[in-house]
């Protein structure tokens, strides 16, 4: 990042720093910034819970839970200076836990959050407002097989994380990596949020390619299953008809016909 010096008609480099070096914390700072202004992540989001731990039979807790404009649940995991190695597995667990939440449960979770932050507004009304004042009965929330998304936020991402995220995209798992960089100029601190995965210019292409790959995989599985079923059928049929000797020298096949 550079600062424009009007007097000298030049630009001056602004120092990028580590959060920890200036005493900034993950929960007290980064998490609160996103909770108060989620649009900093590059899209419209509605934060519906913070440090959510309402999962059955586990005490695990995710950082932030949000809704996007398509009604998907968005799991947001913050890692400050270093993403660490295990954040992907951690967030996938949270996404699986959230996959079973229905609309009423999501509304209840959001209402608990509003009550906790002493906001007197109604969760149903806030959700309706977020979805352009649609009636709550018309809003689809967390519906379908791929209605959970994940956003990772960190200053630096390890290769283990970025490689896994890109690979998972081939299986239609939607994970976004947002690089957050703090800068210091004098006594002021500036913060820049930059989506690095998927690259904005290639996001639509990546989604289409992931969908195509998934469709091709499903077709391949269907063909393989059909071939196996036909092979078993002809094997059993030939054995059953062995007393007539019509197919005595024939072998089972994966084709839908048997040549006499």
Describe the residue ranges of each PLM region:
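Charged, terminal alpha-helix-loop-beta segments
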Residues: 1-260
């Amino acid at each position: 990042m550079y600062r424009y010096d009007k007097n000298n008609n030049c630009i001056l480099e602004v120092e990028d720093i580590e959060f920890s070096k200036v005493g900034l914390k993950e929960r007290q700072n980064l998490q609160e910034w996103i909770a108060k202004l989620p649009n900093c992540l590059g899209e419209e989001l509605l934060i519906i819970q913070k440090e959510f731990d309402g999962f059955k039979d586990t005490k695990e807790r995710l950082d932030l839970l949000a809704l996007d404009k398509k009604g998907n649940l968005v799991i947001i995991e913050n890692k400050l200076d270093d993403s660490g190695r295990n954040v992907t597995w951690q967030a996938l667990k949270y996404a699986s836990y959230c996959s079973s939440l229905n609309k009423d449960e999501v509304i209840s979770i959001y209402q608990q959050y509003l009550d906790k932050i002493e906001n007197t507004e109604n969760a149903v009304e806030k959700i309706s407002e977020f979805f352009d004042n649609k009636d709550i009965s018309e809003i689809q929330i967390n519906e379908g097989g791929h209605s959970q998304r994940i956003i990772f936020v960190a200053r630096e991402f390890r290769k283990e994380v970025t490689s896994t995220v890109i690979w998972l995209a081939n299986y239609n798992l939607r994970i976004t990596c947002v690089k957050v960089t703090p800068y210091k100029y004098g006594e002021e601190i500036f913060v820049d949020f930059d989506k690095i995965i998927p690259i904005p210019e290639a996001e639509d292409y990546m989604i289409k390619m992931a969908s195509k790959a998934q469709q091709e995989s499903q077709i391949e599985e269907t063909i393989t299953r059909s071939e196996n079923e036909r092979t078993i059928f002809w094997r059993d049929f030939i054995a059953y008809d062995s007393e007539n000797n019509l197919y005595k020298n024939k072998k089972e096949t994966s084709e839908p016909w048997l040549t006499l």
